[in-house]
Structure formats: structure tokens, C-alpha cells
């Protein structure tokens, strides 16, 4: 067996494959958001603000 570090090993070696997977994932996931683009946009904003937790000082 070839040595791979963790689950993302294949993507680390093949960025194009990772990019494809990201695109496909984005298209197929979030079924609820397809019907409500505004809700998806709000969720994206909230997610961006809250990730990283301590940076905003609001926890």
C-alpha cells in the first residue's frame, strides 16, 4: 500500500480531483437552499462570521 496521511491524501496529490469533488458537492448538497437562495446567502454569511469563534468576541 502506498503511504497516505489521513483521508485527504488523495486530494493533496490531485488538486483537480479535489476541485471537481467540491463542485459536485456544492451542486448536490443543500437541497433546501436550492428553493430559497436568500436563505442560503444568509446561512453563508452567518457561517463565515461564526467560524473561528473567538475572533469575533461573541460566543
UniProtKB/Swiss-Prot annotation:
List the protein's name.
Uncharacterized protein YciG
Q: Which gene encodes it?
A: yciG
Which top-rank group of organisms is this from? Bacteria
The UniProt regions of compositional bias labelled Basic and acidic residues, in chain numbering, are 1-23, 36-45
One Pfam family per UniProt: KGG
Which residues fall in a coiled-coil region? none
Q: Which family does it belong to?
A: Belongs to the con-10 family.
Species per Swiss-Prot/TrEMBL record: Escherichia coli (strain K12)
Q: Could you tell me where the Gly residues compositional bias lies?
A: 46-59
Q: Where do the segments described as Disordered lie?
A: 1-59
* BP terms from Gene Ontology: bacterial-type flagellum-dependent swarming motility
Amino acid at each position: 500500500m502506498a503511504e497516505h496521511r489521513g483521508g485527504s491524501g488523495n486530494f493533496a496529490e490531485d488538486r483537480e480531483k479535489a476541485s471537481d469533488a467540491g463542485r459536485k458537492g456544492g451542486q448536490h448538497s443543500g437541497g433546501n437552499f436550492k428553493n430559497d437562495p436568500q436563505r442560503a446567502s444568509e446561512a453563508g454569511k452567518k457561517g463565515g462570521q461564526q467560524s473561528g469563534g473567538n475572533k469575533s468576541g461573541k460566543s
